[in-house]
Amino acid sequence: MKQKNSLLGMILCLTAAVVWGLAFSAQAVALEQVGAATLNAARCLIAGLVLIPVILIFDSKTDRRLFSAKEGKLRLDVRKKEWIGGAVCGVLLSIATILQQLGLATEETDAGKAAFITTLYVVIVPLFGLLRGKFPSLRIWLCIGAAVVGLYLLAVPVTDGGFSFRMAYGDLLVLLCAVVFSLHVIAIDVFSAETDGIRLSCIQFFTSAVVPSLVMIFTETPTLAGIWAAILPILYLAVFSSGVAYTCQIVGQQHLDVSIAPIVLSLESVFGLIGGAIFLHETKTPLQYVGCAVVLLAVILSQLNPRKKR
């Protein structure tokens, strides 16, 4: 039975990684029709709506039902920490995704490259642990160093005069996105311990829809024609990348060892590279492929715990 659960967890986490990886290509396609703020607002609004039925299903098995048939109305019994946590996580998520999408909108940053740079958040998280008095181990520092080398090979262009030390603007935006995603992971870690994960995510998505909506009003002029032209990638991002993949991650991690799940989920970078090659016909130089391999290796090694006994 245990083996069956482990297999289920592996399949679900791998499904989440595939969906998230292909989401980079979906974002690139959608950004050809709508602005980053418009895309993020539409995506998060739909994602929040998609999670409401999921909440109803899960709450029907508990005494914290969102809908009360007896009262005939919605019971707003979400605890204060869920509202605060969802709002904080939502603001961070909206900033991270807008930075990512602005980077993808540039010519020099493609979906495959963005996928690997974004995955660096796994390595960056331990650095923020310094602010909480948690000093990273030597293994983590080595992984951080390897990640920097991989990022250099992946993102810094090679000219006739040799290697350049100038990072492309789009790649820099995606790197900033990885930093904000690191803060997002820490925020989830802080708030998720005493909150319902799906409710927290739902509030997060609705908050994440408000922030870019305000940006959209002042900086973009979205049209119904543009939104309709991008409706398929928007629905993919909202329903599959947010609703389905998030649920797969939650259930999958319940059946998979805590040291294995992050490694499987980090494979989204590989599927992001594959998706960019298949759907967007993206290509990489040999050095960039080496950079991808180094980044992936650094991410995987950072999640391994040699002291953990099974």
Report residues per predicted region.
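Hydrophobic/aromatic residues within transmembrane alpha-helices
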Residues: 30, 39, 43, 103, ...
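Glycine-/small-residue-enriched transmembrane alpha-helix faces in small-molecule transporters
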Residues: 1-42, 47, 90-91, 95, ...
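Helix-helix packing/entry segments at the starts of transmembrane helices
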Residues: 17, 40-42, 114-120, 187-209, ...
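Hydrophobic transmembrane alpha-helices of multi-pass small-molecule transport proteins
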Residues: 51, 136-158, 212, 266, ...
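Specific transmembrane alpha-helical segments of multi-pass solute transporters/efflux pumps
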Residues: 23, 58-117, 153, 238-256
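C-terminal transmembrane-helix exit sites in multi-pass transporters
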Residues: 50, 54-55, 121-145, 270-290
